[in-house]
Amino acid sequence: MFQKDVLKGKRILVTGGGTGLGKEMAAEYASLGASVYICGRRQSVLDETVNEITENGGEIKGYACDIRVSEAVNDMIDTIWKDGGALTGLVNNAAGNFISPTKDVTPRGFEAISNIVFRGSFYLTHACGTRWIDEGVKGSVISILTTWIWNGGPFTVPSAMSKAGVNIMTKSLAAEWGHYGIRLNAIAPGPFPTKGAWERLSPGQDTDSNENDAKIPMRRN
């Protein structure tokens, strides 16, 4: 679909890049010639992904980082900048979620999700954006949303609220930073039957199940 090395010279950070959708995006970016960085909570998981993508010829590094902590985010971004210069792209993919009646959600449970999705996405976008503005870099941010921000997300209110915040951050900063040449976009790709996501959102359902196909009018996936 794309020319080989179409992303050569690009430097892209994918948060939550050790597993699932983040891993697949990181692998694709690397296959197209980008220098890729991934971050997540567990260095061991990141190392496995780094080794796998490197074996396939990709250029990638992984950093364990708690994106809920702004100081940790800034330290990681400084490290990446020193490693080879400014990033040209950021993918806000890291997220967390669980199924629960909202009446049972505790403040700690709410913060477990909102601190990753809402705060973490802002910390990363701000850390990259301020550096891009200072250095005159025309960077790009892609944030991953969910359809809950339009349709509502019963039993996933902390995530739905947080993703709605990321959506309005994207629109607001696109308007505010556009004149710097910084682009911000967001996509809601829908559910991917990865092990981690399905265990949290559809407990007991096989990732190979056709149950979700039945929700699609044309039965296509």
Task: Go through each PLM region and give its residues.
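A glycine/serine/threonine-rich, flexible loop-to-helix segment
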Residues: 3, 179, 191-221
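Substrate-binding pocket helix/loop in short-chain dehydrogenase/reductase
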Residues: 101-102, 106-114, 208, 212-213
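Active-site loop-to-helix junction immediately N-terminal to the catalytic Tyr of the SDR YXXXK motif
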Residues: 105, 152-160, 172, 200
